[in-house]
Amino acid sequence: MHWTPEHAQPLNQWPEQHLDVSSTTPSPAHKLELPPGGRQRCHYAWAHDDISALTASNLLKRYAEKYSGVLDSPYERPALGGYSDASFLNGAKGDPEPWPGPEPPYPLASLHEGLPGTKSGGGGGSGALGGSPVLAGNLPEPLYAGNACGGPSAAPEYAAGYGGGYLAPGYCAQTGAALPPPPPAALLQPPPPPGYGPSAPLYNYPAGGYAAQPGYGALPPPPGPPPAPYLTPGLPAPTPLPAPAPPTAYGFPTAAPGAESGLSLKRKAADEGPEGRYRKYAYEPAKAPVADGASYPAADNGECRGNGFRAKPPGAAEEASGKYGGGVPLKVLGSPVYGPQLEPFEKFPERAPAPRGGFAVPSGETPKGVDPGALELVTSKMVDCGPPVQWADVAGQGALKAALEEELVWPLLRPPAYPGSLRPPRTVLLFGPRGAGKALLGRCLATQLGATLLRLRGATLAAPGAAEGARLLQAAFAAARCRPPSVLLISELEALLPARDDGAAAGGALQVPLLACLDGGCGAGADGVLVVGTTSRPAALDEATRRRFSLRFYVALPDSPARGQILQRALAQQGCALSERELAALVQGTQGFSGGELGQLCQQAAAGAGLPGLQRPLSYKDLEAALAKVGPRASAKELDSFVEWDKMYGSGH
């Protein structure tokens, strides 16, 4: 509230009003006890307007300083409920006894003592305020006599006006939490009456006319400026104190350089958990062969190897290629090291250089009784040097690929798993409709075994005659024995081994040497050679031929997902990308197509789009037009015959 004569109130309400204005934190026990006589005299003097507004303001400031000294002094907190009921009533204070302070109660003299005039002397302000107990501007003052903290030796000069804050004379920093923090000193200073300013000539007194007031000491620098609502317009803002240091933040400790935090240790422990321990036995995808050669030993020569494989020195113990090791040691894959006690099973032993029944047994001998010209022809024309084919390159046929791995590839790569008289299979027959992918599977087997691939066609062998065909056939088996491991792929097997009652002269002439080669080239003394025969007419083979092939698998037509995969690969080579709806419609319209027929469909669509280099991009309409020209060749009757023959003679998968 503003302390002006217009808003004067009874003096018995001053302590409560003063507490409301100055602070909201102190308890009622912090109130200063005023003598009843002095309070009545102040009430009388203020009610009869015997003192000016400035004198009343100065008196209030003086008592505020004394009040601050009481708040800053240590005291014994009284018990709760130690005040009488009269202390909560509006009127004179009814506390039973005065509260203790650092000094005895300040005696109040009569307000009229030392005041020669009243507030009516506006022009002679010097004589009217000669006995004012208020500190004048620029007055040096001595220290408090009872200052226990040891204040400064010299008092600072006070700036004119009332914009600065005041602290208690006996102020001393508290080391403990004995007292709550005192209210800001700026709040204890009431605003001056309206119209008052520090530069007004009415209250500009020379400093030499005032004597030093005893009992007052130098004050520390004033605190920061009070909030905006407590600053009176026209008063200068006090000099702010430096900002206090920010509190110490107690965050998480920072790890030293090179040290691992707790979180990283937890992550490391999680990585080495059960999931990491079983990573060693996880099923890895197929990997490309290493650059320094295939993982399966081969003859040491510099000639071209099938499927792009280089020669390896014989007898080198390495891991299997592809998903069976990929030519990369297991230690490089980051698996943890295990002791023998952690692995109760027994690992496959490494392949010996030349075990009995092993697949990779190089002979190193020049074939005898073989025409050198035929051998040169087979070496230059029949050795396949195409790119390697992985399992993922064969669309669909999941069950068939799994059966080939378990029953053919793994036994050949681990011959010690078949001890004694047991020998891994050396011949396999793949039958099914034309274009189903039988030759592609034969190339994939050569890639998985890391073997040289020699390709023969029955029609090519039967065309020049029986004698020439037999000579080429013997040269092919001799070349395969000289290049272990080797895969001899004979397609169109029905042209070489027709049924006995068909009466085909050429076929009958080649049947005897072929059966002899199968018995000799795949017998006990011809290790390292795998013969893969393919046919689209399995019913044309006689019983003797069926017995020569220990494994017989049916290669069916691709299903819908496999057809979609084949079409996507073929159309990507033509620069055509169909939408999902168009691709689904095309897959539905190619029911019964083989893989080869799907490739012919894409070629026909590209031919209808224009000349090579000038054609527009393929569209779905071009493929629809090509569907009218290309269709499936295998009939339902033929497909049923394949299924029946597989049930009777197939190995099953």
UniProtKB/Swiss-Prot annotation:
Localization per Swiss-Prot or TrEMBL: Cytoplasm, Cell cortex
Biased composition annotated in UniProt, kind: Pro residues: 97-107, 219-240
Record-linked InterPro entries: AAA+_ATPase, ATPase_AAA_core, Fidgetin_ATPase, MT-severing_AAA_ATPase, P-loop_NTPase
Molecular function (Gene Ontology), one example: ATP hydrolysis activity
Keyword Transferase annotated: no
Function field: Microtubule-severing enzyme that negatively regulates cell migration and wound healing. In migrating cells, targets dynamic microtubules (MTs) at the leading edge and severs them, thereby suppressing motility. Microtubule severing releases ARHGEF2 which activates RHOA, which in turn regulates focal ahesion turnover via focal adhesion kinase, as opposed to F-actin polymerization, to suppress cell motility. Negative regulator of axon regeneration that suppresses axonal growth by selectively severing dynamic MTs in the distal axon shaft and growth cone.
Protein name as catalogued: Fidgetin-like protein 2
Native source organism of the sequence: Homo sapiens (Human)
Gene behind this protein: FIGNL2
